[in-house]
Amino acid sequence: MYKLVLIRHGESTWNKENRFTGWVDVDLTEQGNSEARQAGLLLKEAGYTFDIAYTSVLKRAIRTLWHVQDQMDLMYVPVVHSWRLNERHYGALSGLNKAETAAKYGDEQVLVWRRSYDTPPPALEPTDERAPYGDPRYAKVPREQLPLTECLKDTVARVLPLWNESIAPAVKAGKQVLIAAHGNSIRALVKYLDGISDADIVGLNIPNGVPLVYELDANLTPIRHYYLGDPEAIAKAQAAVAQQGKASAA
C-alpha cells in the first residue's frame, strides 16, 4: 500500500477578503501561516515523513510547504515547483470579490464559474496586466499553454501530465510524497484519483491547511482517504469554502 498526502495552502490574504485569486501571487495571512504550521505538527505527531514534495510556483502554496517542512524538520527534502499545480486560472474574475460578483451576476452563475467542470469564467485579454505572459515564473512554458481563463476540466488537463510523468512514478517507487497546492489543483487530482463524475465534483470543497491522506493500492487506485485533524472543525472549514461564492457571504 502506498500513501500520498495532499494539502491546500493555508488561508491567503485574498481568501480572507473573499476574492477570486487564481494565478495572482498573494501571500498567506497570519491565520494561514498558523494553519500551515499546525498541519506540519499534525503530520509529525501522526508519524509521517516525506522523501519528496511537490508544489506550485505561487508563494501561498510554497510558504505552506515551508511551514510543514519546518515543523517536521524536513527542510532538506527536495521540492519540485511546477506551474502545473497552480490554482485554476479565474480569468477576468481574478481579484473580484466573490460575494459582490454573486450579487451582480447571481449565485447560480457564480457557482457555475467556481465549481462546474467545463464552464470557464470570461477570459482575460492578452494585454491585461493579470495575464501570465512575461512573468518570469512561466518563462520556460510555451505561450500557447499559458491560460487566460480555465474551467476545472482545463485544470485537470494541466495537472495530469505532472501526475503521470513525475508524481505517480515517485509514489510507485516507494517514495513518501507530499503535495502542497491549491483548492482546484487538488480538486483536479481528487477527481482523477476517485473517478468523481463531472456533476458530483461541483460539491467537493477542499479546506485550507488540512492534510488529506490517500491510501493507494499497487495500481494507485484509492483504498480510502481521510483528513487529519478534528472532524467537526474540518466540516466547518469545508462549509465555509462552499459559502464563499454566495451573495449572502458578503
From Swiss-Prot:
Its EC number is 5.4.2.11. The active site is at 9 (tele-phosphohistidine intermediate), 87 (proton donor/acceptor). InterPro entries: His_Pase_superF_clade-1 (IPR013078), His_PPase_superfam (IPR029033), PG/BPGM_mutase_AS (IPR001345), Phosphogly_mut1 (IPR005952). The keyword Cytoplasm does not apply. The keyword Isomerase applies. SUPFAM superfamilies: Phosphoglycerate mutase-like (SSF53254). It catalyses: (2R)-2-phosphoglycerate = (2R)-3-phosphoglycerate. Pathway: Carbohydrate degradation; glycolysis; pyruvate from D-glyceraldehyde 3-phosphate: step 3/5. GO terms for biological process: gluconeogenesis; glycolytic process. The record marks 182 as: Transition state stabilizer. GO terms for molecular function: phosphoglycerate mutase activity. Substrate binds at residues 8-15, 21-22, 60, 87-90, 98, 114-115, 183-184. Keywords: Gluconeogenesis, Glycolysis, Isomerase. Belongs to the phosphoglycerate mutase family. BPG-dependent PGAM subfamily. PANTHER family: PHOSPHOGLYCERATE MUTASE. Homodimer. Catalyzes the interconversion of 2-phosphoglycerate and 3-phosphoglycerate. This is 2,3-bisphosphoglycerate-dependent phosphoglycerate mutase. It comes from Burkholderia thailandensis (strain ATCC 700388 / DSM 13276 / CCUG 48851 / CIP 106301 / E264).
